[in-house]
From Swiss-Prot:
It is an enzyme of class 6 (ligase). It comes from Pyrococcus horikoshii (strain ATCC 700860 / DSM 12428 / JCM 9974 / NBRC 100139 / OT-3). One of its GO terms (cellular component) is cytoplasm. NCBIfam families: lysS_arch. It is found in: Cytoplasm. This is Lysine--tRNA ligase. Zn(2+) 1 binds at residues 95, 99-100, 106. Zn(2+) 2 binds at residues 177, 180, 199, 203. It catalyses: tRNA(Lys) + L-lysine + ATP = L-lysyl-tRNA(Lys) + AMP + diphosphate. Its EC number is 6.1.1.6.
Amino acid sequence: MVHWADYIADKIIRERGEKEKYVVESGITPSGYVHVGNFRELFTAYIVGHALRDKGYEVRHIHMWDDYDRFRKVPRNVPQEWKDYLGMPISEVPDPWGCHESYAEHFMRKFEEEVEKLGIEVDFLYASELYKRGEYSEEIRLAFEKRDKIMEILNKYREIAKQPPLPENWWPAMVYCPEHRREAEIIEWDGGWKVKYKCPEGHEGWVDIRSGNVKLRWRVDWPMRWSHFGVDFEPAGKDHLVAGSSYDTGKEIIKEVYGKEAPLSLMYEFVGIKGQKGKMSGSKGNVILLSDLYEVLEPGLVRFIYARHRPNKEIKIDLGLGILNLYDEFDKVERIYFGVEGGKGDDEELRRTYELSMPKKPERLVAQAPFRFLAVLVQLPHLTEEDIINVLIKQGHIPRDLSKEDVERVKLRINLARNWVKKYAPEDVKFSILEKPPEVEVSEDVREAMNEVAEWLENHEEFSVEEFNNILFEVAKRRGISSREWFSTLYRLFIGKERGPRLASFLASLDRSFVIKRLRLEG
C-alpha cells in the first residue's frame, strides 16, 4: 500500500497543479507548553512536505506561531499576579520564569529546540513580528473593504448552526490599544488606513492599520495567511474541520475576499497518553512534551509514532510496557527495510514508514540492542556500560565488530533504558538482586535440580543462552518439577519475586560464581 503521506502529496500535485515549489503550513498558539498532541500538527505538515521533496519538488514548510493572540487565562503553574496581563498579546506578557523575553517566547523556544533534534526543517514565523512590521497591511485593509461580504459568509454558517447573526458593529479585525495594550472596540474606519477605537480604559483614538496594532480575527486571519504565503496544504484538528468550522468559512473568505483557492487540508486526531484522562492542555499543565519522549526514545522512534499512524486515527502513547513493544516493532521494521528480515504484504508501506521516520537515513543496519533486554541489564548493579555491551555481544544480540556508529547507538539505548526503568517502568518489571538468599522452602527435587545446574555452570565457562535455557528445562523435566514451581523458586532466590525477566538470559548476565553459590544456597 502507498503510505498516507505519499497519497496526500500526490493529491496536492493533482489538485494544486504542477509547481516548482509547494508551501505547507502548520500553526500553534504558544499559550502554554507545546505538547506531543500539538506536535502532530507540525509533523503532519512536515511529513507531507517530505513526501513532496522525495518526488523532486522544492518545499517551504512554514510554522506560524500565533503569538499575537490575547493572554486569555492564567495557567495553574503561573503566579496569579499574571492576571494583570490578561487581554494583552502573549508576545508582550512577561516570562514568569524570567528566562525569556516574553511568556510566548518561553514556550516557543523550548519547542523549537525539541523539533530541531528530530532533523525537521521548518521556517518558524511569528505573527507578532509580521503584524508589527506591516506585512499584512494590504490584506487587513482589503478585509475592511470586504467587511459586508465577510459578515455575509460568517452569518450564513451561524444561521445553519442556529446562532444569532453578528452585530452590525462587528469588524473583521481588532485593535490593541497602543497605550494599554488590551483589545479595544473599533468604532469607525475612515475608508483608508485609519481606524478609530475605544479601549476598556475609556481611551479613544485613531490608529493606522500599518502600525501593527490592528489584528485580523481568527476566521479572517487564517484564510488571509493562506493567501499571503500561497499555502498549498495545512492540516488541522477536527474542531477546525467540522461542518461550519473555520476551514469552511476560510474557504469562502479566501475566494471572495482574496481571489484565491483554499489549500488542501487533512484532519488529524488527538494524541493522548495511555492511562491519562481528558485532553492534554498546555495551560493546565497535564502534558507530555517531546523532551519527555527523548528521555526514553531515539529520535527515529518519536517520528515513527506519528509516521505509522494515519492522521485520522487517535494515538495513545503508552509510556509503560508499551515502550517495550514500540521498540520491538520499530526494530522489526528496520530489519525489514534493510532486508535482514522478511515481512508480509505491507512491506512497501513499512519500508516507506521507516524512511519517513529517520532524521537521517542510515546506509546500513546499525546495531540494535534489544530495549526489552536492556531494561533488565541496567538493573544489574554490577554491570558497567562496557559490561552491558559485552553481555549483548556474548549473547548474540549485537555483532562483535562494532563501528563508532554502532557503539553510539547502543550507549544511547542503555541510557534511555535506564531512564525508562527509573521513570515509567511498572513495578512488576523492576527488581533488585538479593544480597543474601531468602528463607524459602525448597523441595528436595528442586534442590537437586539447582545443584545440577550449578555443577553444569562450573563445567561451562562459555555457553549460549539457548544451551543454558535447555539445561534449565531439562533438569526440571527429568524430576517432574512443574515449570511454575521451578521458575518461581529461582526468581524468589535471586530477586525475591514470583516472576521476573526471561530467566536464562537474566542468569547468564550475572556473575557465574555468584549464580553457582546462590543455586547452592551458599550466598
